[in-house]
Amino acid sequence: MPTIQQLIRSARQDTEKQTKSPALKSCPQRRGVCTRVYTTTPKKPNSALRKVARVRLTSGFEVTAYIPGIGHNLQEHSVVMIRGGRVKDLPGVRYHIIRGTLDTAGVKDRKQSRSKYGAKKPKA
């Protein structure tokens, strides 16, 4: 425990909160180019083939981003937009690809939560 004199000499430092998405560099979204599109398996109690992409961002980072929704049209050299948001059962995946922007198509035949998957309103 510091003495009063030590506290006068140098005040206590506030610990700065570390960001959970450093590659975004304080921006809400970032553009990037897919360098690899592949599937990976989740952590222990879950079982699936999750679709992910390795993305080289305009901020210079290369990150792994999750591709949400059923079916996608992404391949190498596709230009995508990413946002923050981790996938709990995929270690190291801290970003989501935004569906329906740039080269990423929206989810086909989506009726609910359409805005999250870039799907247009179906014709009545």
Curated annotation (Swiss-Prot):
Keyword annotations of the record: Methylation, Ribonucleoprotein, Ribosomal protein, RNA-binding, rRNA-binding, tRNA-binding
Gene responsible for this protein: rpsL
Subunit and interaction comment: Part of the 30S ribosomal subunit. Contacts proteins S8 and S17. May interact with IF1 in the 30S initiation complex.
Source organism: Trichodesmium erythraeum (strain IMS101)
Compositional bias of kind Basic residues: 113-124
Family annotation (PANTHER family): 30S RIBOSOMAL PROTEIN S12 FAMILY MEMBER (PTHR11652)
Gene Ontology annotations of biological process type: translation
SUPFAM superfamilies per UniProt: Nucleic acid-binding proteins
Physiological role: With S4 and S5 plays an important role in translational accuracy.
One Pfam family it belongs to: Ribosom_S12_S23
UniProt protein name: Small ribosomal subunit protein uS12
Region (Disordered) residue spans: 8-30, 103-124
Domain of life: Bacteria
Residues annotated with 3-methylthioaspartic acid modification: 89
Molecular-function GO term, any one: tRNA binding
InterPro entries membership: NA-bd_OB-fold, Ribosomal_uS12, Ribosomal_uS12_bac
UniProt similarity note: Belongs to the universal ribosomal protein uS12 family.
Gene Ontology cellular component terms for the protein in this record: small ribosomal subunit
